Regions:
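Short, acidic, metal-binding catalytic loop of nucleotide-sugar glycosyltransferases
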Residues: 21-32
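A conserved acidic beta->alpha catalytic loop
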Residues: 39-47, 93
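Short beta-strand/loop segment that forms part of the nucleotide-sugar
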Residues: 31-41
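Active-site beta-to-alpha loop of glycosyltransferases that engages the nucleotide-sugar donor
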Residues: 7-21, 41
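Cell-envelope/extracellular polymer assembly enzymes that use nucleotide-activated donors
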Residues: 2-4, 34, 179
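Acceptor/aglycone-binding surface of glycosyltransferases and processive sugar-polymer synthases
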Residues: 57, 61-80, 85-87, 97-174, ...
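Hydrophobic helical membrane-anchoring modules
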Residues: 171-290
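Short hydrophobic beta-strand elements that form part
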Residues: 4-8, 36-37, 60
């Protein structure tokens, strides 16, 4: 069993050595453990720090590409080098690397395809009450779109089996976290959760500038992933809703026509026609998308 622990980094020179030092080198059931650092256009000594700590596998971006691209490039590299399982953590040392064996256990036992660490966000001291609620809301949206019951969908500390990674297709440029869950849930993969306690905060998030930007980008990623697998739900609703709305003006026109008052109600026909055309277009898109 060959496991790759991949660490996406952007200017993590100060904290990367702590992350590398805390990664267990001997894990029951694992024959080979490799460490991969993805340098996402760092301008500090991140790569130098990785090499000084003996990291043999490094993927470098000449400019910052974002977390999703770093994750995808790391996965491609790990799979090309024979990884059976890929563990993703972070270069800021927010996650307890000593819990990596607990993430691997359900996969090694054949019980899960993906294992996600539950940070228990309600108990994280530096999270504001608003942020905790938004984390809970985001996880709820992901669970609704994926058909899962995960307590912490935004956690980046997770393990993927080779089989699961070969079936996932990350298309967003923001964050892979929620998108891969929506895809995995709709592909009926087995996903488990493991409770952890995060390490003390070392820096502000570089993934987004404020919580509202994070909400917008996360929401967009969730909707896009949902549409990839269940386009019939929103498009079907749109087709039915606009079709019904479109029929109402026609019925109204017919009522006036039978009463001999059809003049002056052409606007109803125009509006109704527009709605029915929209309904037909939605139905056509549904067929194509499905």
């Amino acid at each position: 069993m060959k496991v790759f622990v991949q660490i996406p980094c952007f200017n993590e020179e100060a904290t990367l050595p702590m992350v590398l030092e805390s990664i267990p080198r001997a894990i029951e059931g694992v024959d080979e453990l490799e460490i991969l650092v993805i340098d996402d256009g760092s301008t500090d000594g991140t790569v130098r720090a990785a090499r000084a700590c003996g990291v043999a596998h490094i993927v470098r971006h000449t400019r910052n590409q974002g977390l999703a691209r770093s994750f995808r490039d790391g996965v491609d590299y790990a799979l090309a080098h024979g990884a059976d399982v890929v563990v993703n953590t972070d270069g800021d040392n927010q996650y307890p690397q000593e819990r990596i064996p607990d993430l691997l256990a359900p996969i090694l036992r054949g019980r899960a395809d993906i294992v996600i660490a539950d940070r228990q966000t309600r108990d994280i001291a530096h999270f504001s009450r608003f942020k905790k609620r938004m984390q809970s809301l985001g996880s709820g949206m992901v669970n609704l779109a994926a058909g899962t019951r995960l307590p912490d969908a935004a956690s980046g500390f997770r393990a993927y089996s080779r089989r699961s990674l070969l079936r996932l297709n990350v298309v967003t440029r923001f964050s892979y976290c929620m998108e891969t869950i929506v895809q995995a849930g709709n592909l009926r993969m087995r996903i488990e959760s493991v409770k952890i306690r995060t390490n003390p905060k070392t820096r502000e998030s570089r993934l987004f500038s404020n919580i509202f930007q994070h909400m917008y980008k996360s929401g967009k990623a969730i909707v896009r992933s949902f549409l990839m697998y269940k386009p019939h739900i929103p498009l079907g609703f749109l087709a039915v809703a606009t079709g019904i709305v479109g029929l109402v003006p026609f019925l109204r026109f017919l009522v006036f026509w039978f009463q001999g008052e059809s003049g002056g109600h052409v606007q109803s026909l125009i509006f109704g026609t527009a709605m029915i055309v929209t309904s037909l277009l939605s139905a056509g898109l549904l067929v194509v998308a499905d």
